[in-house]
């Protein structure tokens, strides 16, 4: 309690002291000034949105505008404004994490128009409120984690709440707006976003152009520490690289040389602390005529750490690292998390140990990148969804050639393509991939999700520079017909903040293998750049370039310190296998926390990693939206925190695929989505003493 300046005004001081103590007992304001956290770098941008022309959730587009397949237009495509870039970023990021088709559930089970009870009552769903935007940095000017707080007009300062929405993947700061931000805003909570220090930061090396915090562009030299990301190259190194490798791009997650995943938990905690500052700034009274006081202190606000994929992993890491009670509870979907497993931990299915669990992403992603193109050729996977812009004949040739090269290298067995493909698939099973995800192995590689992740994370885990061209890969613009590196007709940089996802290929910037002048990695060699894929794999298997140490640095201990928590994941996840992520985390948690644990786990059959793929033929008939259960989990946690309702126990949720004709599946109904049960019976998942047992 600050008594400075009271002087001899004893009576007034005593009265103020009494009021202060009463306020403190009720979590209210004190005479202390609200101080911007020390990690906030530069100024804070504050913008109010009226909920009509522009808003927090839809950027003025509403439910209808978000559903449009066409991105909002820029008045001048070469120089979009910050407001235009924000609108496109919200449009693209919202759509990236949910099924946007009406038959698939948009506008009926979720969407801006759907209230928290699942009813279509909110019209276009625009939400008025205020945004606070700033960087978090360590003083170097190179971290520059983007922090964003949205405070809806419906926020009740007497019943405060915060929901974190750490970006998924390597997305920009709006990267979890549909996954977690939307629920928080509808609940009347402040939403604390951050981009995890990856944040879709791009640099066009040839022009030395970078993005700023709002997506607008600047010369890297002039931007200085205001840049979202600038590669750590001298002017001489940059010129030499551009001479040898023109039309190339650097991306923050891959090329910051900081292993940003190490700080994802910290960034999430910082976003919560920044949200506290914003709420005090908005709702605390003035203490001296010009400065706001402190109404909320750490632990005063109900705070749910939420998000999906990488954002989910960040939320778990934050809860583990939390020493000041910033976080009350955790709700995450399909978390990408690297768990430090105890020797006695085990994952079982109906009593039988699975062949592999708890591997880090650096291991399973580089293995999948090597084997998936071959495994996809297996006749047992006939009818798998096709998710590539390449002609089918080209893709089939890639698969055959990858199998042949793997066989020649002694990495698969078999005298013909089918036997080689069967062996590749068997190796994936032995590495912990479930048969439930078999029909997605092709899609994960054909869509370039796995190659993109393997290259980006290998760069991050080795702290490689863009100039290193790790394993002979780079990011470049290419000729649409041939795949060869080429100058673009127009730079992709003006739109990269709005349309990019931070992991090339994205926004017109592709993943290339540096054969000759460089070619799209799928087309650079008949076996789709096998040599590069093998190199990435060997970085892990041979422990090269400090990769093991940097991976060890991102591992977590699965100790949530007694916080109530829910994890949701689809059993068919082929990007982040459930054996290595959620199941492994729950098993280790039962050691790390033991009887203190309040973690429950819901495994969704027929659920996979990318709900945005569900409208695609073959996805629509086979898979259900995991997002639906993420929302249910948030509602369950809210009731648990606010009314003491017990969380339903860990369980398998046995969903029903829509079926029908690929590309024309019948509309999703509640019959496809059974509720999370309070008494799961034979579907209960058991966890304890280092073991998790999941019923098949």
UniProtKB/Swiss-Prot annotation:
Family stated for the protein in its record: Belongs to the D-(-)-3-hydroxybutyrate oligomer hydrolase family.
Organism ancestry: Bacteria, Pseudomonadati, Pseudomonadota, Betaproteobacteria, Burkholderiales
Reactions that this protein is recorded to catalyse: (3R)-hydroxybutanoate dimer + H2O = 2 (R)-3-hydroxybutanoate + H(+)
Task of the protein: Participates in the degradation of poly-3-hydroxybutyrate (PHB). It works downstream of poly(3-hydroxybutyrate) depolymerase, hydrolyzing D(-)-3-hydroxybutyrate oligomers of various length (3HB-oligomers) into 3HB-monomers.
Protein name: D-(-)-3-hydroxybutyrate oligomer hydrolase
Keywords attached to this entry: Hydrolase, Secreted, Signal
EC number per UniProt: 3.1.1.22
Keyword Secreted: yes
Enzyme class: hydrolase
Record GO terms (molecular function): hydroxybutyrate-dimer hydrolase activity
Domain of life: Bacteria
Listed transmembrane segments: none
An annotated GO BP: butyrate metabolic process
Cited InterPro entries: OHBut_olig_hydro_put
Species per Swiss-Prot/TrEMBL record: Burkholderia vietnamiensis (strain G4 / LMG 22486) (Burkholderia cepacia (strain R1808))
Record's GO cellular component terms: extracellular space
Catalytic center residues: 309
Pathway: Lipid metabolism; butanoate metabolism
KW Protein biosynthesis (keyword) present: no
Localization per record: Secreted
């Amino acid at each position: 309690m600050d008594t400075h300046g009271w002087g001899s005004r004893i009576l007034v001081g005593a009265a103020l002291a009494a009021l202060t103590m009463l306020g403190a007992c009720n979590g209210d304001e004190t005479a202390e000034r609200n101080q911007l956290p020390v990690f906030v770098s530069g100024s804070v941008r504050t913008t109010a949105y009226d909920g009509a022309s522009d808003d927090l959730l839809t950027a003025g587009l509403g439910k209808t505008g978000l559903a449009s397949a066409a991105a909002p237009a820029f008045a001048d495509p070469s120089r979009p404004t910050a407001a235009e870039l924000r609108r496109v970023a919200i449009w693209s990021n919202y759509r990236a994490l949910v099924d946007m088709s009406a038959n698939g559930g948009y506008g009926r089970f979720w969407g801006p128009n759907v209230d928290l009870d699942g009813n279509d009552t909110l019209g276009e769903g625009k939400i008025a409120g205020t945004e606070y935007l700033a960087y978090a940095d360590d003083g170097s000017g190179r971290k520059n984690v983007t922090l964003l707080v949205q405070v809806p007009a419906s926020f009740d300062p007497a019943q405060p709440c915060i929901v974190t929405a750490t970006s998924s993947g390597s997305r920009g700061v709006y990267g979890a707006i549909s996954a977690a931000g939307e629920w928080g805003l509808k609940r009347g909570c402040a939403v604390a976003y951050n981009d995890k220090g990856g944040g879709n930061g791009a640099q066009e090396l040839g022009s030395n152009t970078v993005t700023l915090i709002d997506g607008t562009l600047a010369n890297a030299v002039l931007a200085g520490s205001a840049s979202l990301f600038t590669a750590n190259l001298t002017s001489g190194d940059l010129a030499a690289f551009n001479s040898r490798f023109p039309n190339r791009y650097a991306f923050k997650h891959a090329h910051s040389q900081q292993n940003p995943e190490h700080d994802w938990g910290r960034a999430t905690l910082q976003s919560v602390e920044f949200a506290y500052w914003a709420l005090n700034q908005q709702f605390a009274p003035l203490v001296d005529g010009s400065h706001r006081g402190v109404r909320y202190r750490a632990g005063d606000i109900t705070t749910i750490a939420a998000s999906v994929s990488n954002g989910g992993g960040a939320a778990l890491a934050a809860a583990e690292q939390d020493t000041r009670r910033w976080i009350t509870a955790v709700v995450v979907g399909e978390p990408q998390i690297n768990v430090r497993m105890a020797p006695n931990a085990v994952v079982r299915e109906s009593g039988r140990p699975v062949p592999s669990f708890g591997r880090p992403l650096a291991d399973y992603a580089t293995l999948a990148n090597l084997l998936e193109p071959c495994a996809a050729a297996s006749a047992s996977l006939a009818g798998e969804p096709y998710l590539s812009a390449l002609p089918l004949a080209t893709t089939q040739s890639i698969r055959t050639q990858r199998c042949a090269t793997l066989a020649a290298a002694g990495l698969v067995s078999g005298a013909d393509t089918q036997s080689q493909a069967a062996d590749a698939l068997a190796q994936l099973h032995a590495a912990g991939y479930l048969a439930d995800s078999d029909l997605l192995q092709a899609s994960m590689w054909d869509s370039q999700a796995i190659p993109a992740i393997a290259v980006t994370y290998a760069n991050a885990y080795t702290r490689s520079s863009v100039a290193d061209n790790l394993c002979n890969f780079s990011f470049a613009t290419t000729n649409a017909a041939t795949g060869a590196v080429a100058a673009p007709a127009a730079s992709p940089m003006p739109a990269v903040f709005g349309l990019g996802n931070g992991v090339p290929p994205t926004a017109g910037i592709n993943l290339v293998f540096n054969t000759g002048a460089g070619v799209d990695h799928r087309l650079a060699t008949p076996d789709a750049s096998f040599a590069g894929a093998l190199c990435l794999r060997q970085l892990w298997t041979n422990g090269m370039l400090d990769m093991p140490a940097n991976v060890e640095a991102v591992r977590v201990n699965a100790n949530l310190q007694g916080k109530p928590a829910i994890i949701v994941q689809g059993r068919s996840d082929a990007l982040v296998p459930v054996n290595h992520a959620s199941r492994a985390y729950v098993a280790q948690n039962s050691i790390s926390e033991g009887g203190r644990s309040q973690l429950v786990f819901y495994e969704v059959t027929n659920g996979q990693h990318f709900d945005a793929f569900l409208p695609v033929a073959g996805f629509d008939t086979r898979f259900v939206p995991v997002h639906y259960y993420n929302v249910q989990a948030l509602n369950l946690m809210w009731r648990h925190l606010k009314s003491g309702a017990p969380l339903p126990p860990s369980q398998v949720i046995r969903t029903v695929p829509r079926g029908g004709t690929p590309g024309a599946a019948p509309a999703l109904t509640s019959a496809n989505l059974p509720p999370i049960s309070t008494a799961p019976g034979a579907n209960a998942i058991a966890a304890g003493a280092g073991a998790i047992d999941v019923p098949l």
